[in-house]
């Protein structure tokens, strides 16, 4: 009988980049990763690059045992694309567990901090994360400034700009992802209505 390696797969397309990270299941060693900016055709690009990365590394779909996805806030299209791929993957491959984490929490590499993702129209998705607090809100710029002034001891992370790598963020937060028992019950984090 032939045995295949097992893997963990991370997909994030909730903001301005398509991020894919493939990990060895046992060691959490990065096998491969991809980060590319996307503006158009996200659905086609996500599926194409995911298939390409798996083929390049000779990974069979049924050897991915854990699928990690971000739930937003961020791009409405990006959130939905990530969710659809994750739900479909775990439904078709029932031995694969689904884990989810919001994008604001993912942006903070270590423990505590203030996370901000631009929401357009002078507003920001903001998260305050301490040992005892986990608050998420849509804030206008003056309110974000107040939040930062009230928490000067916390580092601020903005728009995934001051990070070393997405794989580092993923690895540092892997224990914060929550198991989604039924993939069809995956919920996305929307803080504002879609733009018409």
Curated annotation (Swiss-Prot):
Pfam families: TsaD
Name of this chain's protein: Uncharacterized protein MG208 homolog
GO biological process, one term: tRNA threonylcarbamoyladenosine modification
Classification via InterPro entries: ATPase_NBD (IPR043129), Gcp-like_dom (IPR000905), T6A_TsaB (IPR022496)
Domain of life of the organism encoding this protein: Bacteria
């Amino acid at each position: 009988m032939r045995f295949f390696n097992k893997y963990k797969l991370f997909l994030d397309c909730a903001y301005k980049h398509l991020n894919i990270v493939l990990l060895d299941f046992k060691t959490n060693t990065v096998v491969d990763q991809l980060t590319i900016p996307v503006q158009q055709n996200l659905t086609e690009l996500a599926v194409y690059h995911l298939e390409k990365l798996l083929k390049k590394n000779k990974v069979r779909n049924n050897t991915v045992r854990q699928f990690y996805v971000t739930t937003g806030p961020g791009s409405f299209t990006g959130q939905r694309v990530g969710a659809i791929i994750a739900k479909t993957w775990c439904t078709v491959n029932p031995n694969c567990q689904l884990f989810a984490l919001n994008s604001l929490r993912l942006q903070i590499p270590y423990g505590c901090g203030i996370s901000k993702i631009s929401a357009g129209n002078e507003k920001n998705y903001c998260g305050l994360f301490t040992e005892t607090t986990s608050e998420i809100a849509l804030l206008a710029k003056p309110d974000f400034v107040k939040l930062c002034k009230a928490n000067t001891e916390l580092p601020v992370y903005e728009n995934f700009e001051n990070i070393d790598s997405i794989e580092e963020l993923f690895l540092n937060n892997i224990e914060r992802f929550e198991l989604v028992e039924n993939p069809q019950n995956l919920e996305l984090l929307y803080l504002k209505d879609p733009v018409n």
